[in-house]
């Protein structure tokens, strides 16, 4: 899994002009699933996300997790995180998991995440418009194969 984590003040995702998911303070996640991803990748990602201390405490130190601040997560599927740009000018996406596997894995990821913190999502495979207000900005890349 490859996940882009953005600390946000608020975020929302719309599909065909209708708001699908909306959060206040927390994380906007762009989530890519790879063909080799297993349940251990899912477990690792969830554990890291809910415990990652990148929110400021009373002294202004990044010392609090999304759980600590009672934040929310907006999770968006993003196969383009597996883009291969080595050849030519058009990215290849053959490094991403096949849609059926990726959709099931993405759903399982969101369900497990929702056991820890409130989660809103987009719709897998849909053309989505994502709006956010970055907080910081703080943007972190989590790759479950690099641990």
Swiss-Prot record:
Localization per record: Cytoplasm
Motif (Gly-cisPro motif, important for rejection of L-amino acids): 136-137
UniProt keyword annotations, A-Z: Cytoplasm, Hydrolase, RNA-binding, tRNA-binding
Matching Pfam families: Tyr_Deacylase (PF02580)
UniProt-listed CDD domains: Dtyr_deacylase
Biological processes, Gene Ontology terms: D-amino acid catabolic process
Domain of life per record: Bacteria
Its biological purpose: An aminoacyl-tRNA editing enzyme that deacylates mischarged D-aminoacyl-tRNAs. Also deacylates mischarged glycyl-tRNA(Ala), protecting cells against glycine mischarging by AlaRS. Acts via tRNA-based rather than protein-based catalysis; rejects L-amino acids rather than detecting D-amino acids in the active site. By recycling D-aminoacyl-tRNA to D-amino acids and free tRNA molecules, this enzyme counteracts the toxicity associated with the formation of D-aminoacyl-tRNA entities in vivo and helps enforce protein L-homochirality.
Family: Belongs to the DTD family.
Free-text note regarding domains: A Gly-cisPro motif from one monomer fits into the active site of the other monomer to allow specific chiral rejection of L-amino acids.
Annotated protein name in UniProt: D-aminoacyl-tRNA deacylase
Organism: Streptococcus pneumoniae (strain P1031)
Lineage, uppermost ranks: Bacteria, Bacillati, Bacillota, Bacilli, Lactobacillales
Gene: dtd
